Amino acid sequence: MNVTGLVVALRAEALCVTPLHVPMNKEIAINPHTVLWLSGMGAESAKKAAEQLCHAGVTRLASFGVAGALDKQLKPGDLVLPDAIYGENLLPVALDWRNHLQHRLSSNTVVVNGVLANSAEPLTTMQSKLRLAEITGACAVDMESSAVATVAADAAIPFIAIRAIVDPVEFSPPGALLSAVKPDGSANLLRILALILNRSIPIGTLLQMG
């Protein structure tokens, strides 16, 4: 029996999978075939989560969550099911599993394949996104999928990434806002208020982020 280990970085991403409260850094059974691990942001956290899931006996790994667009054609809500992951090396995706999932999606879902790039930190300018796109040829970027793909490759188990575009090329969260984000992606409201009061973040930018 296949057991899929889902690695998610953000609490909001976990809520897309289950309405249950998901603690950080703990294996949570979603159903008999799926377990979830809320890792927090970044490659190191995702790597540890994937390794723990492998030790727990999962037979395949998936990186689930959001991504930033590197292609101007991509819009928020588009779904990226990549062909490969561009990290330190070009990492494979289990295309049979990916294709099976893609064929089960609603025809209303905009699905994009191609390459998903890795970034060690959030990209906060259009210029940095376009530069990474030029270097990698990727259509989107995240901070965790490369780490999960590496663990899967080392364990010789299948891997896919499932990433929804959250910010287009022309808009990115301001760098100052990142200091107000907790490890699970939730907001430190007092820190955000302080940033607004000292005008580090225009209130219009927060409204644009929805």
Enumerate the language-model features and the residues they cover:
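Extreme N-terminal starter segment of soluble prokaryotic enzymes
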Residues: M1-G5, T34
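Gly/serine-rich nucleotide phosphate-binding loop at the start of the catalytic core
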Residues: V7-C16
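Glycine-rich phosphate- or other oxyanion-binding loops that anchor nucleotides, phosphorylated ligands
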Residues: L15, L20-G210
